[in-house]
């Protein structure tokens, strides 16, 4: 904070006394049917496939990313929202991602240390809620060859105690 305040002074801001970081992690994940998952020892033991054929269909965006969320996954997402709300973690968006069976959850940003703790809770809750729906949530960064993996985009900001976001684009 001290060095950030020094930079603020160089730009003529004499009011700022403290700068804090905040982050909004976007958690990507794959959802698979539990019965299918249980047939794959590689998925069970490593969280990813170690052998197998390439998928018959790629990740054409028009039919997955922009497609409707499947009812079973939608029900999972609704239940997940409820469980996260109970913990005080509201989600801003949930949607399909580029690869088949891939999705994303983006909680509301928070101060960095709190957002990090919340993301650990989010990942645990995602797995537990999936099991209740007969699904398995895969958080491995690359569980399937030949399609996009799951990343975690982190949207950062530096905010002054006067409420100014230092990373907001200027005019």
Residue ranges, per PLM feature:
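Glycine-rich, acidic/polar active-site loops that bind/position phosphate-bearing ligands
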Residues: 1-139, 144-171
């Amino acid at each position: 904070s001290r060095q950030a305040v020094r930079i603020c002074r160089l730009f003529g801001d004499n009011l700022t006394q403290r700068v804090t970081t905040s982050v909004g992690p976007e958690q990507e994940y794959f959802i698979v049917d539990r019965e299918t998952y249980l047939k794959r020892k590689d998925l069970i033991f490593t969280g990813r496939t170690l052998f197998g054929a390439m998928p018959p269909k790629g990740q054409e965006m028009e039919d997955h990313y922009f497609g409707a969320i499947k009812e079973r996954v939608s029900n999972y997402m609704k239940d997940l929202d409820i469980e996260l709300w109970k913990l005080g973690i509201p989600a801003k968006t949930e949607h399909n991602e580029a690869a088949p069976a891939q999705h994303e959850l983006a909680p509301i940003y928070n101060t960095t240390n709190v957002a990090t703790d919340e993301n650990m809770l989010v990942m645990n809750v995602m797995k537990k809620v999936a099991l209740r729906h007969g699904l398995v949530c895969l958080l491995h960064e690359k569980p399937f060859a030949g399609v996009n993996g799951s990343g975690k985009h982190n949207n950062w900001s530096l905010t002054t105690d006067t409420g100014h976001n230092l990373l907001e684009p200027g005019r």
